[in-house]
Structure formats: structure tokens, C-alpha cells
Amino acid sequence: MVKASVPCMNSGDKETSYGTCSLPQEIVLPKARPILEDTIKDMFSNVSSTDCIKVADLGCSSGPNTFMAISIVVDTFHEMCQQAQLKTSPEFQVFLNDLPENDFNNIFRSVASFTDRIKKGKGDKFGLCFVTGVPGSFYGRLFPNRSLHLVHSSYSVNWLSKACISFHVPDGIGNNKGSVYMAESSPPNVFKAHSRQFKEDFSTFLKLRSQEMIPGGRMVLTFNGRSNLYPSKQDDDWKLQLAKSLYDLVVEGIVKEADADSFNIPMYAPYKGELCEIIQKEDSFDLDKLEVVQINWGPRDVLTNEDFEFDKYQRGQKTANSVRAITEPMLASHFGEDILDKLFTGLAKYEAERLGYKLTSIVVSMKKK
């Protein structure tokens, strides 16, 4: 397998940036919020008001969503302190992690408004919140031993540490022609390669986090998952539409067929049973809660979680922009930037002809043994 970094999202605030087009990521957090809040409440009895609570958000990216999870953590602790009638609350050390290529400058420009909001809303007696950026892959060590109380990550651990592509290794997926991911037409070795790489990566992730967390520390992870046991039966198939648009460019002579055949998106959507099995086998964490949630894919219907009828071309363009926000850097690296506008124009047309569909997410809460 060829090594590849976990992809970064589009930075900045342009129309196709992650900050502008991360609506599915924005709507899944409120659905995961009850589990995150319950996890914090379970932690509360073991936390002193004189402690400094160390919280890490892994794969934070940049944009409006960056501080959403941290805000829930801070708000819930504040609520618990008020209920316990504590005169003071803990201080917070927040670590925002992503790859070095992430737009950390955008994050840092938002820190002051985040901390000002906390101070204004909760008063001077509420513990200070210190924010630090931590560049690096979460498939390596990021923090000292036994230093973290709480780890959160949303839609990040799906990204694989390596691309499951090889034309020389028998179990690679060099024969996944016509696709950019797992599809019904993909041969069995494609599914096996993705599944095996995810198991290896997630096991490594759990092992490393267990070293960095205090005994009894908590971790809440949200995955883009699947509701079907069989990997080829994906709940969302924007990747299928992206493949169609890409191979249209092959037919037009804009993209070489060999280049298209050698591109695969390095991600994996697990089934809930796979997550349980990996967590139990790695054995650093007790599985506390696991919940499968569904969200709509679309522009405004994602925001309201209701099924509205929209102009299909607007919906198609919005969906294409959302896909571009998370895939453009890797596509540009593989094909160059010249094909991107035409590629995503084609994707928008394919998406415009589709009916709305649901995305499956899996929220997991764990406790460090």
C-alpha cells in the first residue's frame, strides 16, 4: 500500500471551503450532543473545581464548526457546576488537532471571539479556557502520557492512514477500475483492503489515545458509518456520482484512464458491529454507548433536518460543493487543478437528478480502562 496523509479539507471561506460547505458535519453534532453531554456528566463526579480539564478535539479542521464540540463541553461543565452550587469551576485546556496543512491561522483568529463569548455568558467565576493548536496526525502520538481527560472527534477517524491502492500487492485495489471507492462492481479484495486498513488504523488510534488519557478518561467519536453489514451497500453514494463524472472526463480525453484507475478515496465507513469488535479486541477502553443516527443530505434540509423540496439544480450544486470541500486537495494532488471545475460541474448535474437520501452516522462513547 502507498502511504498517504489523511486529507486536509479546503481552507478559507470561499464557496467551496470546508467552513462554508460542512453542513452534514454541522447537523450531526446536535444529534451526537446527548451522548457527549451524558459522557461529561458521568465524568463530573471525578473532577475537582480546582482541576484543569484537558480536552482534545481531533481532526478539528477550520471554520464555524471548529468550536461547536468544545462549546458543548464547556457549557455542560458550567451547567453541572451551577447545579452543584460550586463557587468556582475548573479551568480548561483545549487542544485543537489536525494535520499541519490545516488552516490553523483561521482557527486562531476565532479564539478571541470564542473565549469572549464564554466570559460574557458565564461570568468571571467561570474557569478560564486556554486554546492550543496541535498539528500532526492522530495516527501518531500527540500528547504526553496520562494528560487528557476527554477526547472528541467527529467524521475524522473515517480517513485512512494509507491509500489502499497497489498494482503490485495482491490484496491492494489496483483493479478497482471505474470506481473511486468501494462499489457493488468492485472485486472482493477492494472491500478486504479497506476493512483491514481501517481495523489497523482504528486499533492504532485507540492504543495511542489510551496512552495519552488519564485512567477513567472519556472519548466520544462520531463516524460516517453504514447501516448495512455489507460494505458495497453504502448509504450515500456521492462517491459513485463522483466516479461517473471523473470517467466522463476520461471519455472526453481530459483525464488519462490510468490516472483515474489509480485514484481511490482513502476512507472507510464502518458498520456498528465492526466498531464494537475492534474496541473490544484492542481492549484499552470500555464501550459505554453506541448509537446510530440518520441525517439528511442536502442544502437547507440538512440544517433543519426536514425533507423540503428544493430546486434540484441548487441542491446538486450544494452537494457538489460539499463534496469538493472534503476532496479537492487530494484530487488536485492526483490530477492537478485544471480538471476540478469541470469535474464538479459534472458531479452537480448527477446529484441534481437524484432523490434525497440519508447519511448514517455512528456515535460511540468509551471509557479508558
From Swiss-Prot:
Keyword set, alphabetical order: Magnesium, Metal-binding, Methyltransferase, Transferase
Known Pfam families for this protein? Methyltransf_7
Amino-acid positions noted as binding S-adenosyl-L-homocysteine in the UniProt annotation, renumbered to this chain: 18, 60, 65, 98-99, 137-138
How the cofactor is bound: the record states: Binds 1 Mg(2+) ion per subunit.
Q: Which GO terms describe its biological process?
A: methylation
Q: Which molecular-function annotations from GO does this UniProt entry contain? A: metal ion binding; S-adenosylmethionine-dependent methyltransferase activity
Q: Give the required cofactors.
A: Mg(2+)
What Gene3D superfamilies does the annotation carry? Methyltransferase, alpha-helical capping domain (1.10.1200.270), Vaccinia Virus protein VP39 (3.40.50.150)
Q: What top-level class of enzyme does the UniProt entry assign?
A: transferase
> Per the UniProt record, which EC number(s) apply here?
2.1.1.-
Could you say which residues bind Mg(2+) here? Answer: 176, 261, 263-264
Which residue positions hold the site described Involved in substrate discrimination?
152, 224, 337
User: What does the similarity note say?
Assistant: Belongs to the methyltransferase superfamily. Type-7 methyltransferase family.
Q: Could you identify this protein by its name?
A: Probable methyltransferase TCM_000331
User: In which organism is this protein found?
Assistant: Theobroma cacao
